[in-house]
Swiss-Prot record:
Cofactor(s) recorded in Swiss-Prot or TrEMBL: Mg(2+); Mn(2+)
Binding site for Mg(2+) 1: 248, 260
Keywords: ATP-binding, Ligase, Magnesium, Manganese, Metal-binding, Nucleotide-binding, Protein biosynthesis
UniProt-recorded name of the protein: Probable alpha-L-glutamate ligase
Record's cofactor remark: Binds 2 magnesium or manganese ions per subunit.
Annotated positions binding Mg(2+) 2: 260, 262
Annotated GO biological process: protein modification process; SOS response; translation
Binding annotation for Mn(2+) 1: 248, 260
Designated gene of the protein: rimK
Binding site for ATP: 141, 178-179, 187, 211-213
Organism: Xanthomonas euvesicatoria pv. vesicatoria (strain 85-10) (Xanthomonas campestris pv. vesicatoria)
Pfam families for this protein: RimK, Rimk_N
Length: 295
């Protein structure tokens, strides 16, 4: 196969591992910086160009799209989709995952449990809005934040109101969620490829923080996801239209709750902690999917 990887940096761990895995299995792999791609759209057809030359002949494209370039990079990916290139994570699915409110609405529509989430705009409704969550602590999240950025824990009702009012003053879109205390700052990252969880790790927040992201000082250890947790993770990815995803769950008294579905999950943490060749699993999934679509 001829595989394209949409990535701004070929030296990033995840990008390097996907290149290695693809070439090891005999495929031609090329890195495309999405911001260097440009396109022609007309009724007589679609074309994509890169550094002065047309891009043609790719069987599959793996999107590694950072949050800061979401809009442009998904437009490039969509162009490749219209040109008949297979992708495990379509452009519309990535856009769903990057909008926390929309993602939670789609998950809830499939009966997938999550922390209770509220969203509202008018300041006159703030008190009633927050009352739907019960007493604090509350978790306020920017709607398009990533990697733990823009996530605030408020421990008093006055703090919740203050943060909500401040974000409205900045015209920021945000959601507010109930805080699940029994999770004790830990979550479960399930790495979904196709219709199964290929690796899982338990992440623990650093002392004094409640966010378990590894780059914020959290720690991780390999763990075994239960059958229920694996089912929830796969259903969550499917609900957004993704076949490669990092699904973050917390273990609660009412079962696994979905925090987020990441459409561009990093490989370094999960491969290093779990000792699983996730990159190879992704490439094998591409092979199977392209064969099915061709047949």
């Amino acid at each position: 196969m001829k595989i394209a990887i949409l990535s701004r940096n070929s030296k990033l761990y995840s990008t390097r591992r996907l290149i290695e895995a693809g070439r090891k299995r005999g495929h031609t792999v090329r890195i495309l910086d999405p911001l260097r791609c440009y396109m022609r759209i007309a009724a007589d057809g679609f074309s994509l160009h890169y550094k002065g030359k047309p891009i043609t002949g790719f069987d599959a494209v793996i999107p590694r799209i950072g949050a800061s370039v979401t809009r442009y990079a998904t437009a490039v990916l969509r162009q490749l989709e219209f040109m008949g290139t297979y992708t495990p994570n379509p452009s519309d699915a990535i856009l769903r995952s990057r909008d926390k409110l929309r993602a939670h609405q789609l998950l809830a529509a499939q009966g997938i449990d999550m922390p209770v989430t509220v969203f509202g705009d008018n300041p006159d409704d703030t008190q009633d809005l927050l009352s739907m969550l019960g007493p604090p602590p509350h978790v306020v999240k920017l709607n398009e934040g990533a990697q733990g950025a823009g996530v605030i824990l408020t421990e008093k009702a006055s703090a919740s109101r203050g943060v909500v009012e401040a974000l409205r003053g900045l015209y920021a879109n945000f959601i507010v969620q109930e805080f699940i205390g029994e999770a004790e700052g830990a979550d479960l990252r399930c790495f979904v490829v196709g219709d199964k969880v290929v690796a899982a790790m338990r992440r623990q927040a650093a002392e004094g923080d409640f966010r378990s992201n590894l780059h914020l000082g959290g720690t991780a250890a390999v763990t075994e996801a239960t059958e229920q947790e694996q089912e929830v993770a796969v259903r969550s990815a499917r609900a957004l239209g993704l076949t490669v995803a990092g699904v973050d769950l917390i273990r609660s008294k009412r079962g696994p709750l979905v925090l987020e579905v990441n459409s561009t999950p990093g490989l370094e943490g999960v491969e290093g902690v779990c000792g699983v060749d996730v990159a190879a699993a992704i490439v094998q999934h591409l092979e199977q999917s392209v064969r099915r679509s061709a047949g």
